[in-house]
Amino acid sequence: MGHKINPTGLRLGITQEHRSRWYASSKNYPALLQEDDRIRKFIHKKYGSAGISDVLIARKADQLEVELKTARPGVLVGRQGSGIEELRSGIQKTIGDSSRQVRINVVEVERVDGDAFLLAEYIAQQLEKRVAFRRTIRMAVQRAQRAGVLGLKIQVSGRLNGAEIARTEWTREGRVPLHTLRADIDYATKVASTTYGVLGIKVWVFKGEVLSEQAQPMPVGAAPRRRASRRPQQFEDRSNEG
């Protein structure tokens, strides 16, 4: 089951958060969902060179909050924040409401080579430049290992190296526990357009296990806490009273 289902959808509410955080009535829900999709497509199309990893959307009354996780925040912000104003007007034009309040928050990705979407984007760019897929995968694995990820799995499907018959190739380094729900797994897909057709790319990145406060691992060298001895209960025999 863990190998078939989308790892992000399986872990929503456990280790993953929803990309859209808002509530709506059944009447307005489809329109708002399509609006979120248009916003994400607009951002990825217009700012493809900014290395945008994720787009989080929240709604509060008439205010729309958009959080962008990017590897190059300077490309989005621009000089003196001019890029933010351009992005805000572009979002308002996309949703068809120029009076809507749009709040934009730009967050820089700390480990670029440890992000699944940015790794998939790097692989797609190399394949579109006609670099051999085995070398591309090897370089991506090396970059992820330098970023300190615990496990990585990469899968590429299609007419690899221009072969007549499409096939699927994959590689794995380290641990990628897809069946463990507490495992923090970053998953992303990307399509590379080549002269021989399209190639599908999937990337799984294992970043560690998310443990609750009650299940935190014991520090190295610390002695286990002994359970206090339970005092035996004492009962009084009052059957002969009264």
From Swiss-Prot:
Q: Which GO terms describe its molecular function?
A: mRNA binding; rRNA binding; structural constituent of ribosome
One Pfam family, short name? KH_2
Where composition is biased (Basic and acidic residues), the residues are 233-242
SUPFAM superfamilies linked to this entry: Prokaryotic type KH domain (KH-domain type II) (SSF54814), Ribosomal protein S3 C-terminal domain (SSF54821)
Chain intervals for the UniProt region annotation (Disordered): 216-242
Q: Which residues form the KH type-2 domain?
A: 39-110
Stored InterPro entries: KH_dom (IPR004087), KH_dom-like_a/b (IPR015946), KH_dom_type_2 (IPR004044), KH_sf_prok-type (IPR009019), Ribosomal_S3_C_sf (IPR036419), Ribosomal_uS3_bac-typ (IPR005704), Ribosomal_uS3_C (IPR001351), Ribosomal_uS3_CS (IPR018280)
Which key words are in the record? Answer: Ribonucleoprotein, Ribosomal protein, RNA-binding, rRNA-binding
Q: Name one GO biological process term.
A: translation
UniProt xrefs under Gene3D superfamilies: 3.30.300.20, Ribosomal protein S3, C-terminal domain
> Keyword Ribonucleoprotein, does the record have it?
yes
Is-annotated flag, keyword Manganese? no
Per the record, the domain of life is Bacteria
User: A GO CC term?
Assistant: cytosolic small ribosomal subunit
What is annotated about its quaternary structure and interactions? Part of the 30S ribosomal subunit. Forms a tight complex with proteins S10 and S14.
Job of this protein = Binds the lower part of the 30S subunit head. Binds mRNA in the 70S ribosome, positioning it for translation.
Protein family membership: Belongs to the universal ribosomal protein uS3 family.
Query: Could you identify this protein by its name?
Result: Small ribosomal subunit protein uS3
Gene symbol here is rpsC
